[in-house]
Amino acid sequence: MGAVAIPTRTPVIHPTAFIAPGAVVLGDVTLGPRSSVWYQAVLRGDMAPIVVGEVTNLQDATIVHVDEGKPALIGARVGVGHRVILHACIVEDECLIGMGSILLNDVRIGTGSVVAAGAVVPEGMQVPPGSLVMGVPARVARHVDAGLRARIRGTWEHYVAEAERHRRGAFPLERPTL
C-alpha cells in the first residue's frame, strides 16, 4: 500500500527512505534519510505525529501508533526488530529494540539503550541512556557494554545495505542444495 495521506495529514518521505511493498505509512509520518520500513509494518500517524530518524529501520510486522496528542518519536540509527509494537513513545538515538517487544505510552528509551526481545516496557517507564532492559514487565538489567554497542551499529548498517538491495530487486534466486 505504501504512503497514505489522510485529510490534513500527509506522510513526508525522504527520497532515500525505503518503504517495502505491503508496508503502510499513513498520516502524519516523517521518514528521515536512509530510514527503512519493512514488509507488513504499519506506521499509523492518525492522531499525532510519528517521526523516524535517519538510518533507522522498522523491521517486518512492526507497528508504530500514537494517541491523541502523544506522538511516537524514533531517533537516528535505531534498529527496531520484527513484530515490535511502539505506542506513543520516544526511542532516542542509537538504540536496539528487540524482536517482539512492546513499548507502551509515554515510555522513553535513552540513547544507546537495548530493549531485549520480548520485553514489555510499561507505560511511563524512563530508561536511562546506555541501559539493557529486559523482562515482563521490563526492568533495567545492566549497562550496555562495548559488544552490545557494536551490535546496535551492525544492525542499522546492515539494514541500510539491505534497503538498497531490496530497492534494486537484487535477490539471490538460486535454490539451496540439500
What do the PLM-derived regions correspond to, one by one?
Residues 1-12, 46-62, 66-74, 81-178:
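Glycine-rich hexapeptide-repeat left-handed beta-helix
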Residues 6-11, 15-51, 67-69:
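N-terminal first-folded block
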